[in-house]
Amino acid sequence: MSETATWQPSASIPNLLKRAAIMAEIRRFFADRGVLEVETPCMSQATVTDIHLFPFETRFVGPGHSQGINLYLMTSPEYHMKRLLAAGCGPVFQLCRSFRNEEMGRHHNPEFTMLEWYRPHYDMYRLMNEVDDLLQQVLDCQPAESLSYQQAFLRHLEIDPLSADKTQLREAAAKLDLSNIADTEEDRDTLLQLLFTMGVEPHIGKEKPTFIYHFPASQASLAQISTEDHRVAERFEVYYKGIELANGFHELTDAREQQQRFEQDNRKRAARGLPQQPIDQNLLDALAAGLPDCSGVALGVDRLVMLALGAESLADVIAFTVDRA
């Protein structure tokens, strides 16, 4: 959109009408499949420990809390939705605001709309198929292709990400003229992410959506480790036309293992000079009480709408981006 007074919306009114139609289409998709729409809090007393996520923090002062308590805007509704699953709600979805205190640009806004849903008794592959169904319906695109993380690296970088050591990863980075970053990086997963971002992403999802699945176990986050290959996690991401659209897991249900991962994240944070984050005990208690075997996925709605409309930037499909908020 051309430069206008900042009181005006960044997106055109016709685009906002099309966005509303897509939101309605998403709701029909899940209603037709018997998936319950839910609403969960935008704030929590705990937050994510992932070293790559940066939440907004605020402080509540009120009756019973005269000294104030810290609250965090949710980076995704995942933890609350899993508590609903543990309480027996069955399959659920949510369209909600999420917040990340990170970059802004063509594909990023600190406040954004997330579509997240969970399917009890679905494995990773069955959920991938459902994501594919939704993308075909909203984007009118071809059926997606799928590549394992290992296959993607071998095809585009000629290196095995599951066995390569840091020296080999740095050599691969040098071929991409990334030595200035890679040579001083000691974290193997950061090196892998650098190679994936610069050496794999530009080549996938050009003509049709591409699922990348079986990420390294060290990048499992809240996903289960594969029982068939302990080197990989039951995790997938979806890419289309240069954009990461979604991130999904066959969800970890073991409370003790999840706590260990949170604690490991905080140790990594401390080593990098980042603040350690409060662990969500309510989530751990829900896992201990019994999270059903399930798979879940988070999808960026603003990016989906941008692709559906052939727009150049999130600003073309969001009423007011942060610089106009």
Swiss-Prot record:
User: Is ATP-binding among this UniProt entry's keywords?
Assistant: yes
Pfam families in the cross-refs: tRNA-synt_2
Kindly state a single biological-process term from the GO annotations of this entry. lysyl-tRNA aminoacylation
- List the InterPro entries: Aa-tRNA-synt_II (IPR004364), aa-tRNA-synth_II (IPR006195), aa-tRNA-synth_II/BPL/LPL (IPR045864), EpmA (IPR004525), Lys-tRNA-synth_II_C (IPR018149)
* Keyword list, A-Z: ATP-binding, Ligase, Nucleotide-binding
Catalytic activity reported: D-beta-lysine + L-lysyl-[protein] + ATP = N(6)-((3R)-3,6-diaminohexanoyl)-L-lysyl-[protein] + AMP + diphosphate + H(+)
At the top level, the lineage of the source is: Bacteria
Give GO cellular component annotations, separated by semicolons.
Answer: cytosol
Where along the chain is substrate bound? Answer: 76-78, 118, 251
Provide the top EC class: ligase
Assembly = Homodimer.
Hey, which family's this protein in?
Belongs to the class-II aminoacyl-tRNA synthetase family. EpmA subfamily.
**Protein purpose:** With EpmB is involved in the beta-lysylation step of the post-translational modification of translation elongation factor P (EF-P) on 'Lys-34'. Catalyzes the ATP-dependent activation of (R)-beta-lysine produced by EpmB, forming a lysyl-adenylate, from which the beta-lysyl moiety is then transferred to the epsilon-amino group of EF-P 'Lys-34'.
Report the protein name in the record.
Elongation factor P--(R)-beta-lysine ligase
Provenance organism: Salmonella typhi
